[in-house]
């Protein structure tokens, strides 16, 4: 059972990320994808982030029990924001292990997305009119991509993985904790935090109430599930926050797998017949098989590629 003071800290961390999104001076009705709105929100979230990097460790140090007291310094370092620093180890500076953990987590994600990754490669190899550099320019070099692929993964993982998990670990006796609690209770805070998008959609008036409700429920569900993944990674890698950030960023980039881009190009944009059409049809079947294979392999890759024995957070 959570102590009330611990619950208040967890609630504060969750709410403190959402509140700055609405504490803007933008005109009423300004949409979330308006560049001015994005800049204003990122500025205010940055201020809140810097404040919480000191406030949350301070609260943890003040509220931790006398039998398992944690200092402000240890609470701050335990957030995992310093690359290569493993706070729980006798020799905390382990940069080679840090790089190894990052590499293994990326390999795990590439296995999950093996279908879309191979489809991307084949599309650019077999379509002479395509340009990776042009795709990169249009996809990444703008403020929306900076928010989605860099700013959001960093800030959300610091708030909803690092700060929430370390609050559990530092304020609740480990004898009263289970890994299931660590993986799913903080993830629920992360999922519910996305409910505010329903308010934005209502303000825009572009969707029906039923559509907003269904979309919000689905968003809460998949963000809670994704939160469980990043909490698992944080624990298994001994508090390597940057593994969680990289995974979050890559998942935002990849998104939910859609139809094969190669198949769409050669069946809709530049329709081919004969042998090429048959080969594209075969690839399309292979693509969907790889999607299923990547999902099935996730359980095994999580166990084999995430973390190293001796570096994990133990209860």
Swiss-Prot record:
It is a multi-pass membrane protein. Residues 1-3, 66-74, 127-148, 230-237, 297-315 are lumenal. GO terms for cellular component: endoplasmic reticulum; endoplasmic reticulum membrane. Residues 24-44, 96-105, 170-208, 259-275 are cytoplasmic. It is found in: Endoplasmic reticulum membrane. The chain crosses the membrane at residues 4-23, 45-65, 75-95, 106-126, 149-169, 209-229, 238-258, 276-296. It comes from the Eukaryota. One of its GO terms (biological process) is CAAX-box protein processing. The keyword Transmembrane applies. GO terms for molecular function: metalloendopeptidase activity. Its EC number is 3.4.26.1. InterPro entries: Rce1 (IPR039731), Rce1/LyrA-like_dom (IPR003675). It catalyses: Hydrolyzes the peptide bond -P2-(S-farnesyl or geranylgeranyl)C-P1'-P2'-P3'-COOH where P1' and P2' are amino acids with aliphatic sidechains and P3' is any C-terminal residue. Keywords: Endoplasmic reticulum, Hydrolase, Membrane, Pheromone response, Protease, Transmembrane, Transmembrane helix. Belongs to the peptidase U48 family. PANTHER family: CAAX PRENYL PROTEASE 2, PROTEASE U48 CAAX PRENYL PROTEASE RCE1. Protease involved in the processing of a variety of prenylated proteins containing the C-terminal CAAX motif, where C is a cysteine modified with an isoprenoid lipid, A is an aliphatic amino acid and X is any C-terminal amino acid. Proteolytically removes the C-terminal three residues of farnesylated proteins, leaving the prenylated cysteine as the new C-terminus. Target proteins include the a-factor mating pheromone and RAS. Its substrate specificity is overlapping but distinct with that of STE24. This is CAAX prenyl protease 2. It comes from Saccharomyces cerevisiae (strain ATCC 204508 / S288c) (Baker's yeast). The gene is RCE1.
